[in-house]
């Protein structure tokens, strides 16, 4: 309960920081470009239940994104030939673009390194930046992005995000030096959140162990 509450608070704080950063960016005179000009959108792998195996290619799904980072608590593997174009790369952004729950649509995680034998499912999309930084990943978590995707309320009111919707999204494009500074600052904040979450998880486990010993 405490851990879940902390995760909600940290994500809300991060969203507030992102909104402040991108509002300031938007206030500057930077050129505005379409997202499709600076990133490629790659649809995921279609597979059948008979392809599922105990080993093979890891298929990233919506359950593999937890609190903005990759989670491997619920993994599915397929024994199937996967084209090189459907293998994740370092700094790819994986996004849930279709789900029965509208609240999961739009959630993202950054691929932190080159993960061998890893692809993504049909309800997911890889957004592969053409820029040499993680600026687009942070943009995809900002209110500026969500207000374009979910135009009515700024939150998910649809159950899918299509390439056509992404093609219409615009973002301010600062010079590379400014983008790298923004990316570095926001990424360092992500690291602090992740470290705090790990410490909290360890404390919760320690408390449970102590209670078990106490009431034996």
What positions do the PLM features span?
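Sequence-specific dsDNA recognition surfaces
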Residues: 36-49, 63-93, 116
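A short beta-sheet element
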Residues: 61-62, 81-141
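Short amphipathic coiled-coil heptad-repeat segments
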Residues: 1-31, 198-216
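A short glycine-rich beta-alpha junction/loop motif
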Residues: 117-123, 131, 153-177
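Non-catalytic DNA-recognition/assembly elements of restriction-modification systems
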Residues: 15-16, 20-45, 168, 177
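Short, surface-exposed secondary-structure boundary micro-motifs
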Residues: 99, 185-187
């Amino acid at each position: 309960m405490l851990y879940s509450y902390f995760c909600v608070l940290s994500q809300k704080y991060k969203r507030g920081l992102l909104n402040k950063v991108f509002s300031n960016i938007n206030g500057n005179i930077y050129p505005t470009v379409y997202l499709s000009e600076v990133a490629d959108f790659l649809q995921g792998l279609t597979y059948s239940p008979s392809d599922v195996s105990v080993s093979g290619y890891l298929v990233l799904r919506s359950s593999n994104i937890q609190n903005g980072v990759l989670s491997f608590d619920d993994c599915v593997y397929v024994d199937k030939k996967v084209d090189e174009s459907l293998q994740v790369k370092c700094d790819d952004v994986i996004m849930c673009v279709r789900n029965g729950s509208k609240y999961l649509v739009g959630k993202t995680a950054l691929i932190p390194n080159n993960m061998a034998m890893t692809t993504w499912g049909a309800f997911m999309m890889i957004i592969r930046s053409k820029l040499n930084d993680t600026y687009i990943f942070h943009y995809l978590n900002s209110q500026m992005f969500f207000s374009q995707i979910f135009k009515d309320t700024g939150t998910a009111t649809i159950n899918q995000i299509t390439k056509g919707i992404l093609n219409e999204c615009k973002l301010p494009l600062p010079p590379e030096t400014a983008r790298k500074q923004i990316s570095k600052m926001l990424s360092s904040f992500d690291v602090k959140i992740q470290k705090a979450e790990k410490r909290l998880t360890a404390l919760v486990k320690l408390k449970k162990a102590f209670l078990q010993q106490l009431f034996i």
